[in-house]
């Protein structure tokens, strides 16, 4: 058979593509500390499995393409409690936040159109765009500025006739940046001035450790431009449930998104049952989880500061941190570490940073670390990382 150029143009995920090396290390008897993926180790609330066990149905039948009403109402109530008034008609259940993003790109872009992002950015955005022939229009940010946005003038320089949307992750993955209200107001002006869509990926909104957080959904002037992407994956430590949603008050968008939902038939009914139950989780659960991640953030930042030649960002939210390392190539270093380095039978895995950039050559000596392990495991993992840096043949002294 002859495969399409489109599928061959897709890039492997920097988060998962080194998994064969980690699997080989484990097969050789090594313990691998996984800092490469945002898979929380915090227990999923018991409500999820309890509700699934209690679910009674003679047949596991197709569910509503838009999502079951009990879940739609649970999502609606969650947003209402946060000051956002969405109608049931504005909410569509998806197979994770990833499918919500795919639907957004499909609804907005024809081949050759552009989605503006701020790099470094979540690596799968590139794949979601390429699947539909759309392009990433990447605007650089810097660690020196905490990965905050460039000026309004600088952003507008990058807008072209093909630009259809601005896609923001807030809080940021992989940077941990939390945008200020002034930055949000600036983005609001830009998208309305140029009649762009604003795709707000807010799946980490519960994880903010310093200062306040404002959802784009609380800005009524954006009602016609805004598409919110959400998910239960990180919020409730339910990544494998694959339940998310796409939300917008734009009625024309809603008419088109339902076609996508119908084409893939439905989201899994049992996962919808469990997800609806997660929305009944007491606020105290998220408060405790937030405290735990703040502790882990503080742990990894302190540990990284002890490593000579390593520069790290100061994340304010989510559970990721970008680090600049004294190496010739972070991907080569990651492979070398998994294949050739261990301390007492233990090694570490991380995501090479170049996969979070669109600009060729950027991020070559950077890595994204996910601080989703217990603090003592993070300290051990960063110690191993530091010792590996000392031993790595491709170390570059700065």
Positions of PLM-derived features:
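Short beta-strand to alpha-helix junction loop
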Residues: 66-67
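Glycine-rich loop-to-alpha-helix module at the N-terminal edge of alpha/beta enzyme cores
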Residues: 35, 58-62, 74-77, 81
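PLP-dependent class I/II
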Residues: 3, 11-13, 18-31, 37-55, ...
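Short, surface-exposed loop/turn segments at secondary-structure junctions
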Residues: 62-63, 287
């Amino acid at each position: 058979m002859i495969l399409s150029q489109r599928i061959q143009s897709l890039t492997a995920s920097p988060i998962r593509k080194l998994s064969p090396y980690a699997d080989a290390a484990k097969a050789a008897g090594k313990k691998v500390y996984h800092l490469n993926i945002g898979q929380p180790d915090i227990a999923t609330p018991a409500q999820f499995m309890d509700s699934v066990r209690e679910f009674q149905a003679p047949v596991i039948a197709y569910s509503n393409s838009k999502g079951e009403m009990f879940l739609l109402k649970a999502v609606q109530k969650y947003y209402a409690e946060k000051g956002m008034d969405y109608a049931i008609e504005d909410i569509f259940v998806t197979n994770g936040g990833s499918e919500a993003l795919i639907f957004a790109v499909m609804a907005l872009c024809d081949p050759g159109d552009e989605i503006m992002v701020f790099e470094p950015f979540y690596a799968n955005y590139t794949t979601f765009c390429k699947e539909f022939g759309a392009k990433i229009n990447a605007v650089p940010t810097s660690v020196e500025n905490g990965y905050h946005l460039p000026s309004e003038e600088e952003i507008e320089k990058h807008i072209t006739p093909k630009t259809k949307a601005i896609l923001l992750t807030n809080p940021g993955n992989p940077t941990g940046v939390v945008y200020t209200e002034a930055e949000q107001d600036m983005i609001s002006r830009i998208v309305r001035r140029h009649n762009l869509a604003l795709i707000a990926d807010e799946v980490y909104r519960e994880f903010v450790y310093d200062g306040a957080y404002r959802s784009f959904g609380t800005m009524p002037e954006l009602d016609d431009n805004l598409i919110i992407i959400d998910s239960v994956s990180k919020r409730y430590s339910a990544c494998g449930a694959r339940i998310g949603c796409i939300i917008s008050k734009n009625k024309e968008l809603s008419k088109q998104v339902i076609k996508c939902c119908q084409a893939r038939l439905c989201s899994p009914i049992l996962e919808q049952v469990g997800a609806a139950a997660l929305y009944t989780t007491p606020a105290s659960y998220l408060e405790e989880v937030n405290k735990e991640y703040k502790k882990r953030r503080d742990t990894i930042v302190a540990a990284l500061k002890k490593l000579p030649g390593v520069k790290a960002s100061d994340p304010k939210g989510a559970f990721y941190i970008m680090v600049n390392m004294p190496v010739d190539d972070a991907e080569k270093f990651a492979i070398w570490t998994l294949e050739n380095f261990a301390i007492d039978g233990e090694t570490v895995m991380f995501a090479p940073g170049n996969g979070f950039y669109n600009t060729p050559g950027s991020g070559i000596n950077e890595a994204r670390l996910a601080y989703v392990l217990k603090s003592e495991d993070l300290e051990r993992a960063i110690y191993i990382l530091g010792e590996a840096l000392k031993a790595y043949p491709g170390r570059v002294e700065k």
